[in-house]
Design a protein with these regions (language model features):
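Conserved class I S-adenosyl-L-methionine
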Residues: 64-76, 198-225
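S-adenosyl-L-methionine
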Residues: 110-154
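A short acidic, Gly/Pro-enriched loop at the edge of an enzyme's catalytic core
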Residues: 155-168
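A short beta-strand submotif of the Rossmann-like class I SAM-dependent methyltransferase core
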Residues: 170-173
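A short glycine-rich, Lys/Arg-flanked "PGG" loop and its adjoining helix->strand segment in the class I
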Residues: 183-198
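Acceptor-substrate binding/catalytic loop of class I
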Residues: 230-245
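A C-terminal cap/extension of S-adenosyl-L-methionine-dependent methyltransferases
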Residues: 249-252, 258-303
Length: 303
C-alpha cells in the first residue's frame, strides 16, 4: 500500500497554499525522483525527436528554425523544449498553470546536454546547437533559447493570438488534466494553430502509482469508482483515467484531423491483468484491447 501513502501526502500538499513548492521538495529530497536520471533525460531527448519528425512529416512545411512551437504543461526541467532548441527550433511558447520551472533542474538538463553531446548528436544524425552553461533564472530562457515561458497561464484561454503557432506538442501531460479542462485546452490549441499546423501528443495511460509501488498493476486505478478515486486523486498528481478512445474523441471534437495514431499495448500479460481486476462499472464498457492501451501517441492537424 505504498501508493496510498504517497497519494495521501500529495493530496495533503495539494490543498496547501505552497503545495507546489512543497511537492517539489518532496519529490527531490524524499522520493529523490528529481533531478531526472541520465536514462530519463535520454528518453526525453528521443521523444523530442519523435515530435520533431511528426512536425517535419505532417506540419505546414515551415522550417523548424523559422517556426513557433507551443507546449502546455512544460514542467520543471524543460528537457524537451531545450532539446527542440538544440535541434534547431527557432521559437517556443510554453505555458504552465503555475510557475513550475526550477533553474537548478534546467541547469541539470543543460549539463546533461554538454555531457552527452556526442551521443545525442549520433542519435540525432546531426550537429546540435550548443546551449551553453547554467541559467540564473527563467528570465534568461527567451534571449538564450528562444523560449517564452508564461506562468501562471491558463492553457484553456492563453490570450495568445489566433493562428500564431506552427506546432503543438505534449508529452506525458494530458493524463494529468481533468477531462473537461482537456477539451477546452484542445480547442485552444486548435485556435492557436495556423492552418495545416500540427499537434503531436504522447499520453501515458497507466496508473502512475505503479511506477512507485511495483506491487500494483498498471491498471490498478481502473478498479475504483469515480467517487472513490476522488478521495485519493491529488490536484498535484491528478490522473483523469481517460482511455484511448476518449482522447481521440476529444481531439476530433476540437476540430482536428487525425493523421496518425499509435497505441501501445495491451500485451498478453496486460490482458491477463485486466481480466483479473474487478473493474469499476465505468470501465466495463470498453473492449479489452482499448481499455488496456498503455501509451497513446497521435498526430493531428488543423485543416
Amino acid at each position: 500500500m505504498r501508493w496510498v501513502a504517497k497519494a495521501a501526502v500529495q493530496r495533503g500538499l495539494g490543498v496547501l497554499p505552497q503545495g507546489e513548492r512543497l511537492n517539489y521538495v518532496f519529490q527531490r529530497h524524499v522520493l529523490r525522483s528529481l533531478p531526472a536520471s541520465e536514462s530519463v533525460f535520454r528518453r526525453k531527448f528521443s521523444r523530442a525527436q519523435q515530435h520533431l519528425r511528426a512536425y517535419e512529416e505532417h506540419g505546414p512545411g515551415t522550417p523548424p528554425s523559422a517556426s513557433v512551437f507551443y507546449e502546455f504543461g512544460a514542467g520543471w526541467d524543460l528537457a524537451i523544449p531545450l532539446s527542440y532548441a538544440a535541434l534547431g527550433v527557432g521559437r517556443q511558447v510554453l505555458v504552465d498553470i503555475r510557475p513550475s520551472v526550477r533553474a537548478e533542474l534546467v541547469n541539470d538538463s543543460l549539463a546533461a546536454f554538454a555531457r552527452l553531446r556526442d551521443e545525442l548528436e549520433s542519435e540525432a544524425g546531426r550537429e546540435l546547437r550548443r546551449l551553453g552553461g547554467p541559467v540564473g533564472s527563467a528570465d534568461e530562457l527567451e534571449e538564450r533559447f528562444g523560449i517564452t515561458y508564461l506562468a501562471p497561464r491558463d492553457a484553456r484561454a492563453t490570450g495568445l493570438p489566433s493562428e500564431s503557432i506552427d506546432f503543438v506538442s505534449s508529452t506525458d501531460t494530458c493524463e494529468h488534466i481533468p477531462a473537461g479542462d482537456l477539451a477546452e485546452i484542445f480547442a485552444e490549441c486548435f485556435r492557436l494553430l495556423r492552418p495545416e499546423g500540427g499537434f503531436s501528443c504522447r499520453i501515458d495511460l497507466q496508473d502512475h502509482y505503479s511506477y512507485f509501488d511495483p506491487s500494483l498493476s498498471r491498471y490498478n486505478f481502473l478498479r475504483y469508482s469515480d467517487r472513490a478515486w476522488r478521495l485519493v486523486n491529488s490536484p498535484l498528481h491528478h490522473q483523469n483515467r481517460l482511455r484511448s478512445p476518449d482522447y481521440l474523441r476529444l481531439v476530433r471534437e476540437a476540430g482536428f484531423e487525425l493523421v496518425a495514431e499509435v497505441p501501445s499495448g495491451p500485451s498478453l500479460e496486460g490482458l491477463a491483468e485486466l481480466e483479473g481486476l474487478p473493474l469499476a462499472p465505468r470501465f466495463r464498457v470498453y473492449p479489452p484491447e482499448e481499455l488496456g492501451v498503455t501509451i497513446l501517441s497521435f498526430v493531428a492537424r488543423r485543416p
